[in-house]
Amino acid sequence: MEFLCLAPTRSFSTNPKLTKSIPSDHTSTTSRIFTYQNMRGSTMRPLALPLKMSPIVSVPDITAPVENVPAILPKVVPGELIVNKPTGGDSDELFQYLVDILASPVYDVAIESPLELAEKLSDRLGVNFYIKREDKQRVFSFKLRGAYNMMSNLSREELDKGVITASAGNHAQGVALAGQRLNCVAKIVMPTTTPQIKIDAVRALGGDVVLYGKTFDEAQTHALELSEKDGLKYIPPFDDPGVIKGQGTIGTEINRQLKDIHAVFIPVGGGGLIAGVATFFKQIAPNTKIIGVEPYGAASMTLSLHEGHRVKLSNVDTFADGVAVALVGEYTFAKCQELIDGMVLVANDGISAAIKDVYDEGRNILETSGAVAIAGAAAYCEFYKIKNENIVAIASGANMDFSKLHKVTELAGLGSGKEALLATFMVEQQGSFKTFVGLVGSLNFTELTYRFTSERKNALILYRVNVDKESDLEKMIEDMKSSNMTTLNLSHNELVVDHLKHLVGGSANISDEIFGEFIVPEKAETLKTFLDAFSPRWNITLCRYRNQGDINASLLMGFQVPQAEMDEFKNQADKLGYPYELDNYNEAFNLVVSE
């Protein structure tokens, strides 16, 4: 049976029906542990719910945003399979897909990418862990397959008119390359927030770049308008049978390269890649599990399979921007319902750890979305203690924005469990800091931030340590507690990882102070636009911003807002249009900054 538990975090008025997918009949004695998750994908506190698994019910598809779709999904245990019960599908249609996949001309532009045994991962997990290296393609991504397959089936008349698409990433390069090969003008509409390196890459492949809109949705709307106005064929990034079949050629290669595969793990954004690979495998090697992998903060396919129809996420975490899709495709969703075995969710720190794993294997750096499937496959093997099986994960791309590497590095050690981020509250007295260092003992410091302040009794120390064994870390925390030094493990709290170490030095003791995290676009005028909305009406007490090499960035703000003005403040924040969460949604952060 299929299931997914949705649990509310505190009280969010924008998501009043967050619990609608929790079965009302909680009579089962089976108790499962889930955790809250905020809009960033950070771990919150655990929630135990007795669950009775409920089947997916078929309901009409939707194409518009759904207001009651939660922006916050619970964390199932990383690597745990969220089961989908395949419904089958029309055998004649599936067979035609298979024929078209086998006859696809994608090798006019694509190579048969290598399937490489990851020896270090294999040794660590006790399996034969293979990585399908789609990052080795000319455009460093699998996306050229689907774009070329669809475009190669257009008539010469359609090609002569030209094609158009909207993309800020790998699909744009795939369409540009296909247009170059087919002697066809390829117009690519990209948001004005697109990094220059990606714009230059598309132009280098002959793409006619049109910069329009601040978001992908605005760029896509403009592309569709130009398609209608100028008679240009629109090339969707995933939701077209031609695109799906092109991506499905990866399945034929994996099947040629390796037999007796336990499971193939596939990153899921809009669903084109997994739909294509599943269509091939479930007809040729049906015993091989086809498992999709999504980030917790962009789990649109997972949620859609649970609901039985496509749903649109109101907020999407863009850390793995290549799979940050709010609404999966109509064709792709149908194929996933019919064919795949389930979904696995991964956190941003797990994705970062997977990037490091691939780097350790052969000094290659994947983009964040390119490592999603590897993170999911590793977590699945660890959760189910899989041994001596053939495991395949698709490395879908390597178009890493260089400025994002610092964030990946910050998270990688935490995601692998080889490093821990801790906060210790220590009574300010002579010799106490030396005592603290002694209690850390053999756990090697990798970073430490401490500043004496006379304004509060307890000092805050933020630090990272290397961890060989979890038991060593647990003992150290207990030793701290016995010495009256309360210690918190903040390793999976991304807000803390991003911001808190820069704020050590004491609370400001400001009356009516509230904190908020806003997810804002990375562009020049963002901060001014933001401040215009609040200042000088409310006093700014804190501001912390860091470019992440991403579509969006985290902006941490403090404001002085009297309680009587909170409704007015929230209305102003809502009008601004940026996803945000205020005050004490992140308990660990508030405990640390207010201590």
UniProtKB/Swiss-Prot annotation:
This is Threonine dehydratase 2 biosynthetic, chloroplastic. Threonine dehydratase 2 biosynthetic, chloroplastic: Strongly inhibited by 1 mM isoleucine. Processed threonine dehydratase 2: Not inhibited by isoleucine. Gene3D superfamilies: 3.40.50.1100, Biosynthetic Threonine Deaminase, Domain 3 (3.40.1020.10). GO terms for biological process: defense response to insect; isoleucine biosynthetic process; L-serine catabolic process; positive regulation of defense response; protein homotetramerization; response to herbivore; response to insect; threonine catabolic process. GO terms for cellular component: chloroplast. Homotetramer. Keywords: Amino-acid biosynthesis, Branched-chain amino acid biosynthesis, Chloroplast, Isoleucine biosynthesis, Lyase, Plant defense, Plastid, Pyridoxal phosphate, Repeat, Transit peptide. The keyword Ligase does not apply. The modification N6-(pyridoxal phosphate)lysine is found at residue 143. It is found in: Plastid, Chloroplast. It holds the Pfam family Thr_dehydrat_C. Expressed in floral buds, 8-9 mm long flowers 1 to 2 days before anthesis, open flowers and floral organs including sepals, petals, stamens and carpels of 8-9 mm flowers (at protein level). Expressed in very early floral meristems of the anantha. Over 500-fold expression in mature flowers compared to leaves. Expressed in sepals, petals, stamens and carpels of the mature flower. In sepals, mostly expressed in the abaxial mesophyll cells and in petals in parenchymal cells. Not expressed in epidermal or vascular tissues of sepals and petals. It is an enzyme of class 4 (lyase). Its EC number is 4.3.1.17, 4.3.1.19. The keyword Lyase applies. Threonine dehydratase 2 biosynthetic, chloroplastic: Optimum temperature is 60 degrees Celsius. Abnormally stable at elevated temperatures. Processed threonine dehydratase 2: Active over a wide range of temperatures. Optimal enzyme activity against L-threonine is at 58 degrees Celsius. Its main location: plastid. It catalyses: L-threonine = 2-oxobutanoate + NH4(+); L-serine = pyruvate + NH4(+). It comes from the Eukaryota. Proteolytically cleaved by a chymotrypsin-like digestive protease in the midgut of the lepidopteran insects to remove the C-terminal regulatory domain, which allows efficient metabolizing of threonine in the presence of high isoleucine levels in the gut.
